[in-house]
Amino acid sequence: KIVLNDIDERNFEQIEKDEYSNLQKKILEVNPKSAKDPTVSARKSINQLVKLGFVKTGLRNYHRLSKEYLRAPTSAYRNKLFSLIVGEAANFAANVTNHDGRRHVDFITSTLMRIGSLNKKQIIGLMTIDPENHPKGFIDLDELNLASKNASKNSFFERKYNQVSYLCNVLNKLEDLTFHDSKLFFDEDARRL
């Protein structure tokens, strides 16, 4: 809410360095952190909003459903809005200063539609792929298995453990997706198991 209000107060202008520092302070006033440098936590929180698609790079705008998400009267509606926002706008390579047009969640779900299920190793493989290099918007099973094998060789999971866990957590929160026996499925497909 603080970030969205800040965007409104700045009339949807790109955030300046001093404004960004003030925004971090506002966040820490509401949600204090006891870390050595609490502003790191505030910056991570802001970047998470950008990566999930709630807020745009430069903190000059937000997703059309972000305020509705904050006002959602029920958890079910909030979960629905989360899925819509993340599905439409999530970009895990974006941050406050750098825009990145790739739509990772859309790429993952499009691949899942064609493969049926994704194990953690395959999800890790997908994390190493640039969706922009695949104009079809998905990859087939052979490409995915090759990417997974290469990620395994490069110790991607060990180096990116937190990011892998974060992505799996986000995917599990999306409407119509679920993990069953450590594999990602569409809910409808998982119910048939």
What does each model-found stretch correspond to?
Residues 1-193:
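Donor-sugar nucleotide-binding helix/loop cap in glycosyltransferases
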